[in-house]
Design a protein with these regions (language model features):
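Canonical Rossmann dinucleotide-binding motif of NAD(H)/NADP(H)-dependent dehydrogenases/reductases
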Residues: 2-37
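A glycine/serine/threonine-rich, flexible loop-to-helix segment
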Residues: 49, 53, 159, 180, ...
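Conserved hydrophobic beta-strands of the Rossmann-like cofactor-binding core
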Residues: 8-12, 88-93
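C-terminal substrate-recognition "lid" of short-chain dehydrogenase/reductases
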Residues: 3, 83, 219-248, 253-254
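Conserved mid-core segment of classical short-chain dehydrogenase/reductases
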Residues: 63-72, 76-81, 90-116, 155-159, ...
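Short, small/polar-rich loop/turn modules that mediate ligand/substrate recognition or access, typified
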Residues: 179, 184, 241-243
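Conserved SDR Rossmann-fold cofactor-binding beta-strand/turn motif
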Residues: 184-194, 234, 247-249
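Catalytic loop of short-chain dehydrogenase/reductase
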Residues: 13-20, 93-180, 192-194, 252
């Protein structure tokens, strides 16, 4: 038996087998969790059903987080099928391409800001609020994926950095709000990983090289490492951890000065 046996978890954001969310689903399945999945784009529906089947799940639901009725429909379906929910993974983020390339101000606009914050940030507490009745009395856990670009200026990350900064704050406020119900809220800040989402960030390959050169472990990280950390945070083993941003980045966040050639 794994340490998530008996847990019912919802995973969002699985787009490919290179997604961090895929690594999370893989680890949670290994540890015995029962999983459900959502997708935001019909293009990925059939692919996701295939992934879900690998993890013993036939619960694959549409959920565009900009549409409250779709969130409500997921709540209704999971309530019918499971009754309760032991946690969810918020792996959702988007910013218009022009706002995550080049100079910050040149790509900055009101529309891009609204879009990035609505999809990437608002959706985390919105899902927590929607799922709250299902999570009460279950020592449940909420988990999101953030990035160091919400704390420090990272080239080209730009408007998404603003969204991640707000997402980090949302994690802390959710921890405070949900704690009285015994529900935890945390975030994983993974280092750069070659995912479909990351491919949209200009200069991403350079970020990988910088991390490999300067992270204390001298390498990048994998979706499996992020997944193992997520499985722990979603489990009762992490019962005393909430409001935390857990770095899975080979120690890169701890380095103040980059290594330079003599």
């Amino acid at each position: 038996m794994g340490f998530l046996t008996g847990k019912k978890l919802l995973i969002t954001g699985v787009i490919s087998n290179r997604s961090i969310a895929y690594g999370i689903a893989e680890a949670c399945h290994r540890e015995g969790a029962e999983l459900a999945f959502t997708y935001s784009d019909e293009r990925f529906a059939e692919r996701l059903k295939g992934f879900a089947a690998q993890f013993g799940s036939d619960i694959v639901l549409p959920m565009d987080v900009t549409k409250d009725d779709q969130i409500a429909a997921v709540v209704e379906t999971l309530t019918e099928k499971w009754g309760g929910l032991d946690g969810f993974v918020h792996s959702i983020g988007y910013a218009p391409r022009e706002s995550i390339a080049g100079d910050f101000l040149e790509g900055f606009s009101r529309d891009a800001f609204h879009t990035a914050l609505d999809i990437s940030t608002y959706s985390y507490p919105a899902l927590a609020k929607a799922f709250l009745p299902m999570m009460k009395g279950r020592n449940a856990s909420c988990l999101t994926l953030t990035y160091l670009g919400g704390e420090r200026a990272v080239p080209n990350y730009n408007t998404m950095g603003l969204a991640k900064a707000a997402l980090d704050a949302s994690t802390r406020y959710l921890a405070q709000s949900l704690g009285r119900e015994g529900i935890r809220a945390n975030a994983i800040s993974a280092g750069p990983i070659k995912t479909l989402a990351a491919s949209g960030i200009k200069g991403f390959s350079k970020l990988l090289r910088v991390m490999e050169k300067n992270a204390p472990l001298g390498r990048t990280v994998t979706i499996q490492e992020a997944g193992n950390t997520a499985a722990f945070l979603l489990s009762d083993l992490a019962s005393g951890i909430t409001g935390n941003i857990c770095y899975v980045d080979a120690g890169f966040h701890a380095v103040a000065v980059a290594d330079v050639e003599d």
